[in-house]
């Protein structure tokens, strides 16, 4: 029930006469209903905290009879700031909002002080609660207790005992991972990605029930000292992360220095020697990776497959003993959302084509203007046509399957399997429709000529400052990134360049 509180002193009665009535009217208007509990102290000074109506309000609030309190402004509650804060604190602890009718009050010096003090008290209480909670947790950690269920694969959290017990079914998988990784005779010796793919193919589910094992999950398991019986707690410093998150900023969680972390002994799943050897192998793998000089691709991060929609990344291939490079949409790593259709294009061929077009733009700007005029109508309309055909195919596929279910009398028909296919087709149709809408939106938007002109001008200025004969691969990449938004490969002869 909504409660309204009004007050007028003897002096104010003499001056204003109907002050109580005007306050009640304003509070009811704010509440938006006449169905309210009224608490009125008539002829009582705001200096006093003990008032009949205010006492009844506080008592009813403690009994849970009140859901919200509306008051004209804080000086109706009390003339003293401390008393205002006492009442406000009582209500907030019972999750009862205190609302003031007078909107101008918040901007007055008194109002600013009230809300500042209210905020300060609230922060102080939070800090004290956090301090007590944190202190209690630390003491429990130091006594060897497990504070939080971290859903650690291979273990079960026993809340009553505050311990971790080995979950043998999952522990077998942990041992398998370590054995595969550390055994020289294993087909996956030192291969994190190979183990992740193997677990996925075996149908082993992760702790969260996922069917796909990401290589990073396997790496984290291999690096986790809990599996040799040393469980780290108090590892992360989350100070300020909640506030940052509420403010819409990225929350930063820091890892505390090892000497500040608290290690609790738990049952080991693998021997300490095997865990140490796994760390050595992981370190060797990292050093090996860093020692390899990566090939520099002109169109890194810009290429997309026009068939499956995957991004195309650079890969090294070998033919007749010689290395060469391609752009491919194939994703071989474990956990990839889409494996891709396998389209590849020679890096040299694609680079020549794209750089050839860019060179024309920066040496003959009029060609860029003509290209921009044709770009949207050609590229987007062709892509839209392909997607609309795919949508039509999925619709027909769903219709055929639905007809099959409704007309068939065959008891051997796997209805569940057919329903699963229908769901997959619906998902595909939804994704295609979303892409279709996105393209249609792009086609409706007029070219931003000022943005295009600026992009071209920056590219031309950069090109002229270096000179055609002095351009390095990095210089070409800079120029390409000024102008090119994305390169889409439909087939070996159809390449679309989307520009800014």
Swiss-Prot record:
SUPFAM superfamilies from the UniProt entry: Resolvase-like
GO BP, sorted A to Z: DNA integration; DNA recombination
Family of this protein: In the N-terminal section; belongs to the site-specific recombinase resolvase family.
Lineage: Bacteria, Bacillati, Bacillota, Bacilli, Bacillales
Reported function: Putative site-specific recombinase having a very important role in sporulation. It probably plays a role in the recombination of SpoIIIC and SpoIVCB to form sigma K factor.
PANTHER family linked to this entry: DNA RECOMBINASE-RELATED, DNA-INVERTASE FROM LAMBDOID PROPHAGE
Domain Resolvase/invertase-type recombinase catalytic: 1-144
Coiled coil: 372-448
Active site: 9 (o-(5'-phospho-dna)-serine intermediate)
Gene name of this polypeptide: cisA
CDD domains membership: Ser_Recombinase (cd00338)
Protein name: Putative DNA recombinase
InterPro entries: DNA_bind_recomb_sf, DNA_bind_recombinase_dom, Recombinase_CS, Resolv_N, Resolvase-like_N_sf, SSR_resolvase, Zn_ribbon_recom_dom
Keyword DNA-binding attributed: yes
Pfam families: Recombinase, Resolvase, Zn_ribbon_recom
Keywords tagged on the record: Coiled coil, DNA integration, DNA recombination, DNA-binding
DNA bind region: 152-288
């Amino acid at each position: 029930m909504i409660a309204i509180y009004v007050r007028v002193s003897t002096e104010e009665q003499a001056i204003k006469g109907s002050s109580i009535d005007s306050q009640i009217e304003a509070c009811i208007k704010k509440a938006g209903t006449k169905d309210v509990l009224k608490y009125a102290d008539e002829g009582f000074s705001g200096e006093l905290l003990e008032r009949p109506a205010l006492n009844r309000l506080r008592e009813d609030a403690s009994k849970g009879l009140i859901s919200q309190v509306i008051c004209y402004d804080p000086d109706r509650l009390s003339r003293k700031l401390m008393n205002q804060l006492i009442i406000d604190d009582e209500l907030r602890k019972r999750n009862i909002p205190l609302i003031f009718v007078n909107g101008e009050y918040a901007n007055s010096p008194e109002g600013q002080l009230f809300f500042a003090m209210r905020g300060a008290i609230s922060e102080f209480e939070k800090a004290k609660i956090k301090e007590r909670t944190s202190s209690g947790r630390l003491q429990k950690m130091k006594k060897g207790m497990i504070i939080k269920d971290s859903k650690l694969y291979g273990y079960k959290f026993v809340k009553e005992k505050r311990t971790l017990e080995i979950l043998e079914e999952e522990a077998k998988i942990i041992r398998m991972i370590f054995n595969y990784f550390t055994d020289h005779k294993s087909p996956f010796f030192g291969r994190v990605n190979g183990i992740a793919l193997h677990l996925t193919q075996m149908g082993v589910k992760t702790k969260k029930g996922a069917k796909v094992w990401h290589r990073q999950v396997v790496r984290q398991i291999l690096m986790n000292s809990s599996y040799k019986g040393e469980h780290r707690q108090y590892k992360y410093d989350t100070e300020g992360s909640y506030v940052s998150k509420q403010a819409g900023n990225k929350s930063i969680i820091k890892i505390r220095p090892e000497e500040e972390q608290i290690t609790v002994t738990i049952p080991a799943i693998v021997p300490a020697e095997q865990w140490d050897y796994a760390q050595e192998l992981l370190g060797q793998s990292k050093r090996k990776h860093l020692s390899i000089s990566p090939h520099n691709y002109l169109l890194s991060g810009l290429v997309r497959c026009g068939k499956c929609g995957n991004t195309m990344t650079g890969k090294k291939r070998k033919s007749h003993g010689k290395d060469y490079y391609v752009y491919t949409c194939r994703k071989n790593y474990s956990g990839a959302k889409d494996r891709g259709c396998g389209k590849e294009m020679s890096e040299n061929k694609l680079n020549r084509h794209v750089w050839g077009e860019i060179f024309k733009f920066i040496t003959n700007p009029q060609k860029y203007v003509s290209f921009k005029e044709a770009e949207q109508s050609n590229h987007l309309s062709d892509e839209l046509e392909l997607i609309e055909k795919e949508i039509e195919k999925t619709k027909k596929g769903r219709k055929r399957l639905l007809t099959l279910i409704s007309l068939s009398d065959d008891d051997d028909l796997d209805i569940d399997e057919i329903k699963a296919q229908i769901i997959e087709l619906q998902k595909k149709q939804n994704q295609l429709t979303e892409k279709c809408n996105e393209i249609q939106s792009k086609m409706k938007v007029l070219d931003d000529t000022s943005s295009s002109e600026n992009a071209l001008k920056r590219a031309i200025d950069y090109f002229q400052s270096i000179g055609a004969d002095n351009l390095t691969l990095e210089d070409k990449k800079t120029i390409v990134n000024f102008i090119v938004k994305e390169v889409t490969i439909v087939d070996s002869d159809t390449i679309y360049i989307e520009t800014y």
